């Protein structure tokens, strides 16, 4: 299994008025192989989302290194790409899933999934066709023309997953993806992500405070005191 992504010694502190900087990440190390599903658990405020933002190039670490397919992405205190190049990298190589779906309320499920590709290419019909295939794969073939308000919470999150997969990313970063779902839909969501990681050879890094479903992942890490440690999740 080839290594897709590796972060070494990631540090991050935030300045506080009149006080010393508050360290959030203390030399955190993380790797993900191709097609591997990694879950990061930990208490709220432990730095899980901060780390995910660093991995997704949405924020800048204070120190450490990030490698993608063996090539340095962040090293020696700076990203190795311009802001424009980083945005292109994110759009092409990384998919994002958030606790809040951020679906466009005036657009159908199919249009929400197709939107980013349409904006990038200017070709609507091919984007809609690919979106329809993805939604069908995720069990939503009968919901293509439904607005977000007409979908259940679980269906909305599956639309968000389809949107994240639209650019055929190598890596998907998910921040509390089941936070607004009941236990039954949360279980289905994690089962779906586990299946997708194997079928598509897509790596998933999932952040959650809920240990119940972490056992479905290939590897579980616990965020504690700004560092990541192997953990044994609840079964």
Curated annotation (Swiss-Prot):
Its EC number is 7.6.2.-. ATP binds at residues 42-49. Pfam families: ABC_tran (PF00005). One of its GO terms (molecular function) is ATP hydrolysis activity. It comes from Chlorobium luteolum (strain DSM 273 / BCRC 81028 / 2530) (Pelodictyon luteolum). The lineage of its organism: Bacteria, Pseudomonadati, Chlorobiota, Chlorobiia, Chlorobiales. It is a peripheral membrane protein. CDD domains: ABC_MJ0796_LolCDE_FtsE (cd03255). Part of the ABC transporter complex LolCDE involved in the translocation of mature outer membrane-directed lipoproteins, from the inner membrane to the periplasmic chaperone, LolA. Responsible for the formation of the LolA-lipoprotein complex in an ATP-dependent manner. This is Lipoprotein-releasing system ATP-binding protein LolD 1.
């Amino acid at each position: 299994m080839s290594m897709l992504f590796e972060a070494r010694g990631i540090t991050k502190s935030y300045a506080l008025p009149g006080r010393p900087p508050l360290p959030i990440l203390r030399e955190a190390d993380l790797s993900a192989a191709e097609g591997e599903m990694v879950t990061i658990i930990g208490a709220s405020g432990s730095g899980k989302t901060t780390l995910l933002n660093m991995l997704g190039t949405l924020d800048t670490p204070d120190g450490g290194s990030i490698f993608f397919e063996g090539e340095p992405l962040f090293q020696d205190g700076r990203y190795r790409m311009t802001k424009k190049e980083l945005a292109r990298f994110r759009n092409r190589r990384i998919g994002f899933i958030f606790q809040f779906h951020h679906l466009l309320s005036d657009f159908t499920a199919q249009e929400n999934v197709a939107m980013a590709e349409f904006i990038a290419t200017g070709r609507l019909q091919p984007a809609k066709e690919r979106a329809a295939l993805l939604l069908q794969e995720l069990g939503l073939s009968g919901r293509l023309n439904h607005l977000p308000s007409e979908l259940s919470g679980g269906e909305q999150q599956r639309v968000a997953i389809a949107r994240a997969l639209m650019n055929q990313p190598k890596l998907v970063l998910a921040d509390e993806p089941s936070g607004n779902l009941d236990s039954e839909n949360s279980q289905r969501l994690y089962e779906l992500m586990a299946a997708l990681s194997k079928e598509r050879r897509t790596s998933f890094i999932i952040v959650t405070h809920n240990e119940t479903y972490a056992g479905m992942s290939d590897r579980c890490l616990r965020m504690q005191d700004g560092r990541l440690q192997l953990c044994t999740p609840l079964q």
